[in-house]
Amino acid sequence: MARSVWKGPFVDLHLLKKAETAQEGGSTAPIKTWSRRSTILPQFVGLTFNVYNGRKFVPVSVNEDMVGMKLGEFAPTRFFPGHAADKKGKR
């Protein structure tokens, strides 16, 4: 079920404050965050976030196409190495 329109998008306040100060100061340093649940807002465009995926911080550069999505969508938590190849000489 989708979030109600009247509530608006969810963003952690500490992340919003860090993004506003980075925009005002013109800082290019990435913003480190654990908040994968925060929605990407239009004022985040052009910023870089380091999003934690449970093991390391993944750099996420925000562009216009990402607005409305969550930060966690761009930092995968699981690694799939692929299925094993068939063994040809098995008989």
Curated annotation (Swiss-Prot):
InterPro entries hit by this protein: Ribosomal_uS19 (IPR002222), Ribosomal_uS19_bac-type (IPR005732), Ribosomal_uS19_CS (IPR020934), Ribosomal_uS19_SF (IPR023575)
GO biological processes: ribosomal small subunit assembly; translation
One Pfam family per UniProt: Ribosomal_S19
GO molecular function, one term: rRNA binding
Entry keyword Transmembrane: no
Keywords annotated in UniProt: Ribonucleoprotein, Ribosomal protein, RNA-binding, rRNA-binding
GO CC field: cytoplasm; small ribosomal subunit
SUPFAM superfamilies the record matches: Ribosomal protein S19
Family: Belongs to the universal ribosomal protein uS19 family.
Protein purpose: Protein S19 forms a complex with S13 that binds strongly to the 16S ribosomal RNA.
Name of the protein: Small ribosomal subunit protein uS19
Source organism of the structure: Sphingopyxis alaskensis (strain DSM 13593 / LMG 18877 / RB2256)
Name of the gene encoding the protein in the UniProt record: rpsS
